[in-house]
């Protein structure tokens, strides 16, 4: 990723309690479930798109940041998750085409909702509307974050911390897994990456019963405090106590990823016939102009060939190497 600014997107507990979703009547449990559900979509889609883990991690952080400023009632969680994956893939220099992202999310929705898996046709107006919505949501993401998309993950600190603490090798993978799971929570918008890294190292050490230095306290060497580490462990424990997150319909703009209230196919928004005629006329005019240019170009090439054959006394032009 290209770092353009300092990572300063952090909120207090009071700000999270007064989130835009809460103001729209969405309770804390529903908001937590939708956050986990959206992060699950980002993680699963990243695997299907064969993206590196850094892309999924960045996408999940962008997802949490966006819903700290916007409500789940106004922006569909599935479409925002798709835009986060698309934007994160570009930020982490592993870009994917919009068509690939849309096809993957369409397939995931069919499998999760037990619907017949149908191929997403990329030619009808519905696909054009989906692609337009993907672009529109990406612009919303960038606008709400002031085009500052710098993300610092705890993963890069974990290896250094474990090496400094001289912990056993099995602790590394466990800490890495906990860091991935922490991205499903709001820890990334509450604490700096160093604190989250210390928290997951502490949780992994307790799980494997590995003692860590306490005199002096080991976390002070990494600019962390005990209260922050305890909160990270508490949030992770609460996450593991929750059932698998399922989609909860709260958005006013429709619940499906592939259908929208703004669809071109909606009878409430008919397409003017005059517009269709004008578009067809423009298309026909472009075709005629293109054919004319091709014919004119062919005539010019023929004239050049005739001149060359006359110049070189009837020797066929294809004998010469240009």
Give the location of each predicted region.
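Structured all-alpha helical bundle cores of eukaryotic regulatory proteins
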Residues: 29-198, 202-231
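An acidic, Gly/Ser/Thr/Pro-rich helix-cap/linker signature
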Residues: 1-24
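A short, structure-level motif marking secondary-structure boundaries and short turns
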Residues: 26-28, 123, 237, 244
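C-terminal region detector
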Residues: 3, 10, 188, 203, ...
